[in-house]
């Protein structure tokens, strides 16, 4: 009897982990032929092989190198592999990418930190009517006329912060700048003295998210645990590191909750006329909506949503922009001639200490430089992985419910089909009239595209130009010859270590 039970269990394992995923892969291979590359792995070792390769190579280290090499060799439309029984399909063809991005309601974004109390209710990961409501509430704050009013504040923060710039941790210094800009401009909190675990609040939020997201790459056991148990994985045989991270999350949420509660009390103590005329930053908008709710249970859920929205927007506005700036500084250090050309432009177009909104439009070379960095080393190199919520088709590609879908537009950014000398860094390509070949408007999409594109793209570019302009006015940027660099995945795709460049004051 026992032997038959064992046979049944082994048969089930064989079906789930081998026959089921392999059958789907073979069907796709038969349908698309050479346009579909497949790689069956029993425990989804593909990603871990990439990590191993990234660690063992030298200064060209990049977690995506293997995928870029495979794409350039085979020119496939889809790359299909598996994580246990789950199919993961990476879409490389821009026409299929376009369809997937336009039909976003057929997917749910996968939360890289896999934790219910941090990002799941924020704008980036919410879905359906909740997402539409959040996007509508917040969209006016990202319109260009509203952003222009923030230019003096961005200059002031940048100038005060770069005076204390640390070459020991350049990325952290940049996070301090971008995070304070977000806190003051979008949450109306007029202080940079909120500390937690010996770090500024904005830096601690970024550190927590990056460390939690990176946990999934620490070992195959960690990744498999998340895949099977989802958000409950943090409480199943937690390691010491996981316990420490969970405590930091609790401490951080407590501080954010206090900030939200203070704003609620301020509104409650204010008369209606004052509420109507108060500056409409994100926190005020969200709290105003909260105060319209009379049901206590719904109020508690909304309070938690405000905390998560705060964390989501604070992190998105802090880390991604800071990592982009860090990448720009690295390429400026690698290409000193380009650095000098752009510095000359900044000093010519922006002669005063502040860089104003009218001058920003004249910084053509700086804009082109940022575009080239985004083409080659975008912090959001691969958009957030999506899981299909229903069976559907992308053109003639059948996607089944539960499949993981990756939209790998970074492959097109470095393809000779669309860019001359695609593997070379050449910011001057963006000074030409038509830098992109065979463009369907979904080739170069550094901030994604479609209805769920990055709501903060204009803000990120505005910040990047002002902060880089201010740094170029005051500092010479060189590479740190004492470190070896690599391009890793934490939450974003980012340069490591955090002191790969050195800023020297211009005398």
Per-region residue spans from a language model:
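N-terminal membrane-proximal hinge/A-helix region immediately C-terminal to the signal-anchor transmembrane segment
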Residues: 2-119, 127-129, 133, 153-160, ...
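Cytochrome P450 I-helix active-site segment
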Residues: 34-40, 151, 155, 200-212, ...
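Cytochrome P450 catalytic-domain helical core, especially the substrate-recognition surface
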Residues: 38-65, 87, 112-187, 200-265, ...
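Conserved cytochrome P450 K-helix/beta-meander segment immediately N-terminal to the heme-binding cysteine loop
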Residues: 407-435
